Amino acid sequence: MIDAHAVNLGPYGFLLVNLTLLFMIGWALWKTERNLSSQSDTIVLFLLGIFAVSGRILLEPIPNIQPVTVIILMSGIYFGVSRSIILATSVALISNLFIGHGLWTLYQAFGWSLVGIIGAVFSNKLHLNNTSSNTPLMIVAIFCAFIFDWVVSLSVLHTLGPDLLFVYILAGIPFDILHAVGNIFFVAWLASPLSEIMTRHLSVKKPLAVKEIVKNRI
């Protein structure tokens, strides 16, 4: 009976299945969020974590393409440093339990935490509203792709030594570019809906809400 389900889909078939699952998860989480009361920021953070983990696992066949960096960047912008670090660390650990856990998980947690901190520090510049462009956010997301990858590259110091670190980083630039291109796509796709969701669940409801929350949570 089990063999009857063992269909050989090939790499593109599996990718299509994974993308379908990711969109189903995203739609279900969006519907769930619509039923939440306002200022449910902790629950929203949990839902974002589910989507980030799912996206990283399901998109793993595509090298260095995942929604995690953009999600954590935006969580830093809207929810502050502390919660973005919680999200960064949890996503790194939980997703790596499925795709491979090791010392690099610590560096990934550091890298994504730094992305969240960058979002919090520049929150007043990156906060989206109905009239603002997402171009500044896109530029920062590109920058964060390289920052994250280079932080994770530091993990090779435990095996290769400092003399080969620069060579290792240079060899990884094509993958860094893929990460940056992926971030451009995810900003274009996710920035507006995530901004709307996060703004709706901010704990402070006034024009400087984002700035005040970030200041209070650093």
Predicted feature residues:
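Membrane-embedded alpha-helical hairpins and interfacial helices in multi-pass inner-membrane proteins
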Residues: M1-N18, T105-Y107, K125-V214, I218
